[in-house]
C-alpha cells in the first residue's frame, strides 16, 4: 500500500536524527548549530542533539528584539542563537539595540567588523565581554520575564536570566550554598520600541539595579546612547526611564540581591 505523507516525513526526520547521532559519536567535541531555516524547525528532537539553535533570520532589529525576548519559552538560554549585527553606519542607539538581543543567549555576532572604527569596535567588544561573563553563569540561570511574557508588537520588552534556588540546589549545590549567604547577581535586558518613556518593574525587595550595557563607565564607546535613569519607586518596584524618547533603545542591567 501507499504510505502517507506524514509517515514519510517521520521516517525522513528519524534518518536525519540518526545521521546527526553518528556525527556526534564520531566528533564529540564539534559544536553544531541547528539553523533550520530561521528556527522554523526548532523541535526538541533536534535541540536535544545539537548545541545551538538560530532563533530567526529576521533582519529588522526592532522585530528581532521580540524574538530574543521570547525565545526562552522554548529554547534553553545556552542554546539561543540570537543575532547581534551592529554596523559602522548605525547610530549608537541602534547598535546597542541589536547587540542587546544576543548578550543573554548565545551571541551570533554579525556585521562587517572589519569596517568598524575604533568607537564602534569598542562597543562590540563590551557586548562580547559581558556575554562571556553571562556564559559562565548560564548553566544555573533560568529565563525570567518581570513584565510577563513579551507582546510581539508591544512597545516595551523585558527578558532576563535569574537564579532559581530549587534548580541550583538540585544541579549546582555549590551555587545554591553561595546564594544562601551571599549577594547574587541576575541579568535583565529591556527594549523600548515606542510608547511612554518609562517602565515600572516589580523586581523584589532589596534589588539593586545597575546598567552594564552600554557601560556607563565607557561613555565614549556609545556617546549617543546615554544611560537610562533608574529610580526605586518603593522597596519592590523600579522605574526605568529612557535617555531619548524619540527613538527605540535598549539597555542591559545587572540586578543584585544581598542576602538578608
Residue ranges and their predicted role:
Residues 10-115:
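Glycan-recognition surfaces
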Residues 34-36, 113, 189-192, 201-203, ...:
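Active-site proximal loops enriched in glycine and acidic residues that flank catalytic Cys/His/Asp
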Residues 101-106, 110-149:
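Aromatic- and carboxylate-lined catalytic core of secreted/periplasmic carbohydrate-active enzymes
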Residues 204-222:
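Solvent-exposed beta-hairpin/edge-strand motifs
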Amino acid at each position: 500500500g501507499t504510505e502517507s505523507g506524514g509517515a514519510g516525513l517521520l521516517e525522513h526526520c528519524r534518518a536525519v536524527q540518526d545521521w546527526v547521532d553518528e556525527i556526534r559519536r564520531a566528533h564529540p567535541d564539534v559544536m553544531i548549530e541547528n539553523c533550520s531555516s530561521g528556527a522554523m524547525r526548532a523541535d526538541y528532537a533536534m535541540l536535544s542533539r545539537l548545541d545551538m539553535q538560530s532563533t530567526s533570520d529576521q533582519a529588522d532589529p526592532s522585530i528581532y528584539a521580540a524574538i530574543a525576548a521570547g525565545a526562552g519559552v522554548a529554547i534553553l538560554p545556552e542554546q539561543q542563537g540570537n543575532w547581534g549585527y551592529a554596523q559602522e553606519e548605525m547610530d549608537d542607539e541602534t547598535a546597542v539595540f541589536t547587540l542587546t538581543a544576543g548578550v543573554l543567549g548565545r551571541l551570533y555576532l554579525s556585521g562587517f567588523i572589519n569596517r568598524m572604527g575604533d568607537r564602534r569596535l569598542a562597543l562590540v567588544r563590551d557586548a562580547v565581554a559581558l556575554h562571556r561573563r553571562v556564559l559562565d553563569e548560564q548553566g544555573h540561570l533560568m529565563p525570567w520575564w518581570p513584565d510577563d511574557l513579551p507582546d510581539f508588537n508591544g512597545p516595551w520588552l523585558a527578558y532576563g536570566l535569574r537564579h532559581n534556588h530549587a534548580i541550583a540546589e538540585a544541579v549546582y549545590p555549590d551555587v545554591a550554598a553561595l546564594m544562601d549567604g551571599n549577594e547574587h547577581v541576575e541579568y535583565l535586558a529591556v527594549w523600548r520600541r515606542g510608547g511612554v518613556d518609562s517602565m515600572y518593574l516589580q523586581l523584589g525587595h532589596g534589588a539593586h539595579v545597575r546598567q552594564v550595557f552600554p557601560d556607563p563607565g565607557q561613555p565614549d564607546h556609545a556617546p549617543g546612547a546615554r544611560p537610562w535613569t533608574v529610580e526605586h519607586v518603593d522597596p519592590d518596584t523600579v522605574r526605568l526611564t529612557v535617555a531619548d524618547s524619540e527613538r527605540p533603545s535598549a539597555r542591559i542591567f545587572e540586578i543584585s540581591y544581598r542576602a538578608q
